[in-house]
């Protein structure tokens, strides 16, 4: 029988996705960040409890229809997440903690279930470039190290604590949206709010030399 899972999604509500600035305006990047968050929450709502960790000032109505709790924290990402783990530990560990990044609009329920079914005191799903896109924590000793090449740091954290680590290698879970070229993946592989938004912005895929490239002829939205 699968243990209860509490999903935690950290969300940066200001100055988000600056590496997309060559393709999207500041307002468009904000709208996309919200759309991706909502796509992630829609995937997670069938898994268990869901909490969004955000800085104070984020509007609660953005996620009000998605059965998620909004929790504010002034702390940096790693400290906010580790504080959440501390509280879960103090409460007797009522549920395992699944940390999911908010820029994974490609993930589906089966990707999350694969994480939950993978054995280990901690289960890591790497992102491209050395990041960690999802972490399932079953052992209350584990704490996150979300800076720089976090995947290697999380592996080392588990090793140093003597925690058995499991790994979940998924294309969709590994596809975080950071660069303009990543937007193609949304248009190709999703049918959620993120794709609808990019199409409304006028973005589309053109074929060039047998490969897809992003047409940045955009609307003024």
Swiss-Prot record:
Pfam families: CofC (PF01983)
Nucleotide-binding among keywords: yes
Assigned keywords, A-Z: GTP-binding, Nucleotide-binding, Nucleotidyltransferase, Transferase
One Gene Ontology term from the biological process aspect of the record: F420-0 metabolic process
EC numbers: 2.7.7.68
Membrane-crossing residue ranges in chain numbering: none
Family: Belongs to the CofC family.
UniProt function note: Guanylyltransferase that catalyzes the activation of (2S)-2-phospholactate (2-PL) as (2S)-lactyl-2-diphospho-5'-guanosine, via the condensation of 2-PL with GTP. It is involved in the biosynthesis of coenzyme F420, a hydride carrier cofactor.
NCBIfam families in the record: F420_cofC
Name the UniProt record assigns to this protein: 2-phospho-L-lactate guanylyltransferase
Organism in which the protein naturally occurs: Methanothrix thermoacetophila (strain DSM 6194 / JCM 14653 / NBRC 101360 / PT)
Encoding gene, per UniProt annotation: cofC
